[in-house]
Curated annotation (Swiss-Prot):
Signal peptide span: none
Modification N6-acetyllysine occurs at: 204, 698
Coiled coil: 643-713
Function: Component of the cap-binding complex (CBC), which binds cotranscriptionally to the 5'-cap of pre-mRNAs and is involved in various processes such as pre-mRNA splicing, translation regulation, nonsense-mediated mRNA decay, RNA-mediated gene silencing (RNAi) by microRNAs (miRNAs) and mRNA export. The CBC complex is involved in mRNA export from the nucleus via its interaction with ALYREF/THOC4/ALY, leading to the recruitment of the mRNA export machinery to the 5'-end of mRNA and to mRNA export in a 5' to 3' direction through the nuclear pore.
Source species: Mus musculus
Tissue expression remark: Expressed in the spermatogonia, spermatocytes and granular cells within the cerebellum.
Lineage: Eukaryota, Metazoa, Chordata, Craniata, Vertebrata
The protein's name in its UniProt record: Nuclear cap-binding protein subunit 1
Length: 790
């Protein structure tokens, strides 16, 4: 830090001032680098580095105290995997400068309050954990920490608040105990027993209706799928029974015990959990993912049991590493494989399990799906001799458990596995999965293999996929993705509209205009009625069929050719698809043409929605139509539906944002007018108020359309599921068919993937669709969803 003390020779005042500013910035950057990098690989020991850094920071406190405070609060929040390193550093600084220690504690409490107010509950957990570990470093007095935890657990006694609020405060308390439980029990055992008793009482009366919706597997063998608070409570109970002996947390402060025990401690200021408000959004509950146990790696170090607190600590630290470095896959992979204490645990098994736990987390993974694919690829490159084998073992386990796996997680498994294979020349021992060849094609295993090969084809080409799998798998291979043109062979001569199709083909090739196409279509007879209207464009399925079939056939060369065709003849599409029936029929014909090319179907539907040829409700009705019944359980169908819902949601959000911006602009103009007597602003206000009124109408119309879309989707789900249940009851057969599992879990998927939007329409859904008279099997899904934020 000697840069600050350099003397500068200069003749003028201004250059000297500029150099001082530059020098201060350099020093601040250097401090940031030192603080962020402490604990990384170094020639010196961690203890030596911490002692040296504490000395540097102490020397810089007079000039850079606020910067140092801010940096330490930030790393406490953003680098939780290095928690004990930073608590030790704060402990050393507190021992040297008591006032700084007090200011740091106050700053942390302020930051905790801000995080809770801003609904940053994940960061708030790390701040609470950091504060609790400061007890071990003799910065915070144990009784005041116990008092804070008493206030946390008192939230369980609150009335008329969501369960997820109570859950968070209990979790914040329990998840800190692996670090500080021993110290708190030694100092305040009676108070801690009282807190434990309150916690246990709460956990026993908690509702767990939400659990089935969040489980990766419906079966508890070989590993139970436990609710996260139940699992953590069992781990803490075992830790308490073992006299708080924990062997995995890095505790560098133990090396400085003689220094830290002499330091004066601070009492936490009284902390009252902020009250629940309408704007409070708490973390959703989770189910703990388990894939491995000690039997899966008999030769290596023993994997801690599921109720061992070491399992919690290891998983928590690995999750924290991913959270800190997920945007840099190479750095993230390097940090994971260099995890401290890696020789004491089967690290590769833990890493793979944690990554799949995040990928399969419901309702959504913490990060985008493709990040996990790229991270696993990097890990395979870093550990080529060991990690690919563990990953292959995990893949085999997932395949074996497909029968009870959530459909949403199966989708993610398909997407991950196909993408992963594409990076390794699609090599896989397919013969090991030949058991799927003897099963019904709708069963989970053959269905999974079929969908994987379909996705692989998107990342390669059809013939290559045929070449990489054994001939015995041919029934599961995707069809050749070619266009099916019904007017293309001699046998089609007798088909209605054949002659018009020939005329259209010539016209398209001759670069005909929209008007010329209208002229050709004008005389196409309408099979639905004797007399057409004057314009000749009332819903006419034959017109749509001839036009769409011929145009898509001629534009079949590529995606861009098809897009150009839609754009050029947009006016014809809009006219033919003017009615709801017309929109539905356009989708049906497009599907007939591209039945063997799911990717083309998906991109064409996407384009038709964007260009307003069809609307979102038409797509939903088409997906539930009889024409798609054979493909109803195919993955591409549900990708289209979710994409459609997302488009609708984005459309509503876009208009809402425009409305908010207009209102803010008007408020600014009002403020300016009150500050400055400007009469011309009256005219501006009038124009803006008109714009706000128009936007308000657009928002209401868009929300009505959005609500209608969800009503259509849920109504169709209820209809087809009810038909299935009634049919099974009439026939005396089991309802638990592969189709039923897929369908009921697709219903769950809609709720989960769009939960934030659907929450707005809960009352409408409950009053109109999910009523008490509904079959309990279907109603249970709605009740599980309601329980997620209850």
């Amino acid at each position: 830090m000697s840069r600050r003390r350099h003397s500068y020779e200069n003749d003028g005042g201004q250059p000297h001032k500029r150099r001082k500013t530059s020098d201060a910035n350099e020093t601040e950057d250097h401090l940031e680098s030192l603080i962020c990098k402490v604990g990384e690989k170094s020639a010196c020991s961690l203890e030596s580095n911490l002692e040296g850094l504490a000395g540097v920071l102490e020397a810089d406190l007079p000039n850079y105290k606020s910067k140092i405070l801010r940096l330490l609060c930030t790393v406490a929040r953003l680098l939780p995997e290095k928690l004990t390193i930073y608590t030790t550093l704060v402990g050393l600084l507190n021992a040297r400068n008591y006032n700084f220690g007090g200011e740091f504690v106050e700053a942390m409490i302020r930051q905790l309050k801000e995080s809770l107010k801003a609904n940053n509950y994940n960061e708030a957990v790390y701040l609470v954990r950091f504060l609790s570990d400061l007890v071990n470093c003799h910065v915070i007095a144990a009784p005041s920490m116990v008092a804070m935890f008493e206030n946390f657990v008192s939230v369980t006694q609150e009335e008329d608040v969501p369960q997820v609020r109570r859950d968070w405060y209990v979790y914040a308390f329990l998840s800190s105990l692996p670090w500080v439980g021993k110290e708190l029990y030694e100092k305040k055992d009676a108070e801690m027993d009282r807190i434990f008793s309150t916690t246990e009482s709460y956990l026993k009366r908690r509702q767990k209706t939400h659990v089935p919706m969040l489980q990766v597997w419906t079966a508890d063998k070989p590993h139970p799928q436990e609710e996260y608070l139940d699992c953590l409570w069992a781990q803490i109970q075992k830790l308490k029974k073992d006299r708080w002996q924990e062997r995995h947390i890095l505790r560098p402060y133990l090396a400085f015990d003689s220094i830290l025990c002499e330091a004066l401690q601070h009492n936490l200021p009284p902390f009252t959990p902020p009250p629940h408000t309408e704007d409070s959004v708490y973390p959703m509950p989770r189910v703990i993912f388990r894939m491995f146990d000690y039997t899966d790696d008999p030769e290596g170090p023993v994997m801690p049991g599921s109720h061992s607190v070491e399992r919690f600590v290891i998983e928590e630290n690995l999750h924290c590493i991913i959270k800190s470095y997920w945007k840099e896959r190479k750095t993230c992979a390097a940090q994971l494989v260099s995890y401290p204490g890696k020789n004491k645990i089967p690290l590769n098994y833990h890493i793979v399990e944690v990554i799949f736990a995040e990928l399969f987390q419901l309702p959504a993974p913490p990060h985008i799906d493709v990040m996990y694919t790229t991270l696993l690829i990097e890990l395979c490159k870093l550990q080529p001799g060991s990690l690919p084998q563990v990953l292959a073992q995990a893949t085999e386990m997932l395949y074996m458990r497909l029968d009870t796996m959530s459909t949403t997680c199966v989708d993610r498994f398909i997407n991950w596995f196909s993408h992963h294979l594409s990076n390794f020349q699609f090599r896989w021992s397919w013969e090991d999965w030949s058991d799927c060849l003897t099963q019904d094609l709708e069963s989970p295993k053959p269905k999974f293999v079929r969908e994987v090969l379909e996705k692989c084809m998107r990342l390669s080409y059809h013939q290559h996929i045929l070449d990489i799998v054994p001939p015995t798998f041919s029934a599961l291979c995707p069809a050749n993705p070619t266009c099916i043109y019904k007017y293309g062979d001699e046998s089609s001569n007798s088909l209605p509209g054949h002659s018009v199709a020939l005329c259209l083909s010539v016209a398209f090739k001759s670069k005909a205009t929209n008007d010329e196409i209208f002229s050709i279509l004008k005389d196409v007879p309408n099979p639905n009625q004797v007399d057409d209207d004057d314009e000749g464009f009332r819903f006419n399925p034959l017109k749509i069929e001839v036009f769409v079939q011929t145009l898509l056939h001629l534009a079949a060369k590529s995606f861009s050719h098809s897009f150009s065709a839609l754009a050029k003849f947009h006016e014809v599409f809009k006219t033919l698809a003017e009615s709801d029936k017309g929109k539905l029929h356009v989708l049906r014909v497009m599907f007939e043409v591209w039945r063997n090319h799911p990717q083309m179907i998906a991109v064409l539907v996407d384009k038709m929605i964007r260009t307003q040829i069809v609307d979102c409700a038409a797509v939903a009705n088409w997906i539930f139509s009889s024409e798609l019944s054979r493909d109803f359980t195919r993955l591409f169908v549900w990708e289209i539906l979710h994409s459609t819902i997302r488009k609708m949601n984005k459309h509503v959000l876009k208009i809402q944002k425009e409305l908010e911006e207009a209102k803010e602009k008007l408020a600014r103009q009002h403020k300016r007018r009150s500050d400055d007597d400007d009469r011309s602003s009256d005219r501006k206000d009038g124009a803006l108020e008109e714009q706000i009124e128009r936007l308000q109408e657009k928002v209401e119309a868009a929300q009505s359309e959005q609500k209608n879309l969800f009503l259509v989707i849920f109504q169709r789900f209820i209809m087809i599921l009810t038909e299935h249940l009634v049919r099974c009851e009439t026939d005396g057969t089991s309802i638990l068919t592969p189709w039923y599992k897929n369908c009921i879990e697709r219903l769950q998927q809609i709720f989960l993937q769009h939960h934030q939007t659907i929450q707005q329409y809960m009352v409408t859904l409950e009053n109109l669709l999910f009523t008490a008279e509904l079959d309990p099997h279907i109603l249970a899904v709605f009740q599980q969803f309601c329980a997620l934020q209850a």
